[in-house]
Amino acid sequence: MAENTMWHETLHDQFGQYFAVDNVLYHEKTDHQDLIIFENAAFGRVMALDGVVQTTERDEFIYHEMMTHVPLLAHGHAKHVLIIGGGDGAMLREVTRHKNVETITMVEIDAGVVSFCRQYLPNHNAGSYDDPRFTLVIDDGVNFVNQTHQTFDVIISDCTDPIGPGESLFTSAFYEGCKRCLNPGGIFVAQNGVCFLQQDEALDSHRKLSHYFSDVGFYQAAIPTYYGGIMTFAWATDNDALRHLSSEIIQARFHAAGLKCRYYNPAIHAAAFALPQYLHDALSAQ
């Protein structure tokens, strides 16, 4: 791709977004996907896979703070964390901020993504790949959760959209495997798209997860990069109390963890579980 051109996202057929490409840092098709990292004056470094924006330097903190601190602080004493995907390292960066976590395992299908991001998105991973608690496994996520002998307190599925390599991370086989290696009282969370535009994806995840977990729901965050604005995250556990903890409990845990965030705070934590009526109606109708 030439510099000083427009890059168009291909996620939706009838509408979408574009970015001015100021400088192409890397563009290559790996064994699994078409990866590009380029610079944009407004959003900094942008990474896209198969024509779909995955992350930008400017607003990645919103996504990664909400995907990590919500389940980890709701759990309260997570020792072992599993990240599925997350090759850019930003999810790992946020998990490493929790000093009580003892082991962090990341399963990434494409070793190339990890090496590219270490070089081209250093602000995302911020040295977290060198954390002594971290183990990288190059494997398919579905295979890992169905074969591993390890168990985890929190599982974070930092998946792409349900197309291409990411499609398997929205299947019953994956959700069943996650339940299999989740400790009692553990929490599973996953990226679930922009619900206003991808509602079927959320409904499908809810239906499948409900076969394996007694408490299944969603929480949300406003992330500008993802077209449509409001990103939905799947939430699944067998402890329904964890979704309804008091603000005092979350505040105490937040303070004890010594976290200083740019988006997440205890009030946002509670508010994130308030869902729009159209989603409530759709869930009730299925």
Curated annotation (Swiss-Prot):
- Swiss-Prot/TrEMBL GO biological process terms: spermidine biosynthetic process
Where's the PABS domain?
Answer: 5-238
GO CC term, one of those recorded: cytosol
Recall the GO molecular function terms of this protein's record: spermidine synthase activity
Membrane-spanning segments: none
* Keywords tagged on the record: Cytoplasm, Polyamine biosynthesis, Spermidine biosynthesis, Transferase
Q: Which InterPro entries match?
A: PABS (IPR030374), PABS_CS (IPR030373), SAM-dependent_MTases_sf (IPR029063), Spermi_synthase (IPR001045), Spermidine_synt_N (IPR035246), Spermidine_synt_N_sf (IPR037163)
The main location class comes to cytoplasm
Q: Which reaction does it catalyse?
A: S-adenosyl 3-(methylsulfanyl)propylamine + putrescine = S-methyl-5'-thioadenosine + spermidine + H(+)
Locate the active site.
D158 (proton acceptor)
Where does the UniProt annotation locate this protein? Cytoplasm
- Sites binding spermidine sit at H64, D88, D158, C159, T160, D161
> Which pathway does the UniProt entry assign to this protein?
Amine and polyamine biosynthesis; spermidine biosynthesis; spermidine from putrescine: step 1/1
UniProt keyword Cytoplasm, yes or no: yes
CDD domains, per database record: AdoMet_MTases
Subunit organization? Homodimer or homotetramer.
Q: Which HAMAP family match?
A: Spermidine_synth
Function comment: Catalyzes the irreversible transfer of a propylamine group from the amino donor S-adenosylmethioninamine (decarboxy-AdoMet) to putrescine (1,4-diaminobutane) to yield spermidine.
What family does the database annotate? Belongs to the spermidine/spermine synthase family.
UniProt-recorded name of the protein: Polyamine aminopropyltransferase
In which organism is this protein found?
Answer: Salmonella typhimurium (strain LT2 / SGSC1412 / ATCC 700720)
